[in-house]
Amino acid sequence: MKVQPSVTCVASWGGIVHLEAFGDPVIVLRGAWAVPRVDCLIDTLRTPNASCMRKGTHLLVPCLEEEELALHRRRLDMSEALPCPGKETPTPGCRLGALYWACVHNDPTQLQAILDGGVSPEEATQVDSNGRTGLMVACYHGFQSVVALLSHCPFLDVNQQDKGGDTALMLAAQAGHVPLVSLLLNYYVGLDLERRDQRGLTALMKAAMRNRCADLTAVDPVRGKTALEWAVLTDSFDTVWRIRQLLRRPQVEQLSQHYKPEWPALSGLVAQAQAQAQVAPSLLERLQATLSLPFAPSPQEGGVLDHLVTATTSLASPFVTTACHTLCPDHPPSLGTRSKSVPELLGTAPPPPLVPQSPPGSPQRSPWVFVPYQSPQGILSKCLQWLQPRDSTSPRPQVPKILLSKASSSSHQCQPKPSPSGHQSLALPLWRYQELRIEKRKQEEEARMAQK
């Protein structure tokens, strides 16, 4: 029997709101409050222990009883003998472990039982024929509960790449799974945002090409384009607008304790309104105000609606009652800075996975070699010097002169073969114009020989 967990919202307008979980152990908060990246942490989202997992008090895990744990452990022992299903069996013989199949089948209860029993380094890093781990498959399909539980899995390398060079973050960003991207950024230690695939593309570039929404100035070594240029090239106008908004506002000021919920343009607008009230409007202004149709203006950047959203989502907002606290109030999220994950801020980060070191003296080779893209203009550099465009001030080299001379006729001339006599083979007829052409050629050759 699958347990329906009950989750309490951590923030609301003046009170506590209960949200329905829909059978999913991971709850995405929607509405006026959105938990900011890394900086706000729910008190209950700490490293869970075995007791809270069994009692169902943790937000990311379902309620498990002792009988259910024993039942799932028996299912895990039997899973090794199950036949491999169709497309989910990349390797012959089906030697993939139970951890991989729990991720593929989107079974968080079975995955939690596996994590409680302990995971070996071989099981955590096991891949299929495409080079993908269970975390990559879950990120590709959008299994949010599985990705949340795998954040507590030891020996798991979040930056592991498949045969195409894609990481778990690339697969989630390219597929447009925003909650999974947020989980990877906030709860996975050592996540490399600038890891590149075989084509030299980062996760941000792949998300921009897919119109989804790092370093915005990073370019791929093949085409030399940034994420904004890739978004423009692939007609991802929504992503272009988001990137430009992020460049205009590189820092989230309202998530700092030093933010004051005051509108800077308020004093200037009040003074302007008072000055206009003292001056009587002219006849033209009255006529224009009478004849003009009242259209609702769209929200402007830095206007009153923009300030309202910023003030209500700040940490010192008097309108929203929050039950969470920020871990780094002096360092709000900003563009160009790598924020720490929640386990790093809490000091509960697991040790990094062991990387096999090459023996000393052996050269370190990169797994992929990127070939730079050569524009059509670069072909001119390989041409001759006189073919390249030059300005009027530089000396222009002389164009070489090419003289063509016809080879003299050799003394040995091919004699026509005599036609065989008989009625079996007939000679081609020789017309009058052909005879005149032959005579003219003979005369020209005789005149040329006489001149020599």
From Swiss-Prot:
ANK repeat ranges, renumbered to this chain: 94-123, 130-160, 164-193, 223-257
Positions of region (Disordered): 335-369, 405-427
SUPFAM superfamilies: Ankyrin repeat (SSF48403)
Keywords, alphabetical: ANK repeat, Cytoplasm, Nucleus, Repeat
Localization in the cell: Cytoplasm, Cytosol; Nucleus
Signal peptide (from-to): none
Principal location class: cytoplasm
Transmembrane spans: none
Hydrolase keyword on record: no
Protein task: Acts as a transcriptional repressor for CRX-activated photoreceptor gene regulation.
Protein name: Photoreceptor ankyrin repeat protein
Organismal lineage: Eukaryota, Metazoa, Chordata, Craniata, Vertebrata
Gene behind this protein: ANKRD33
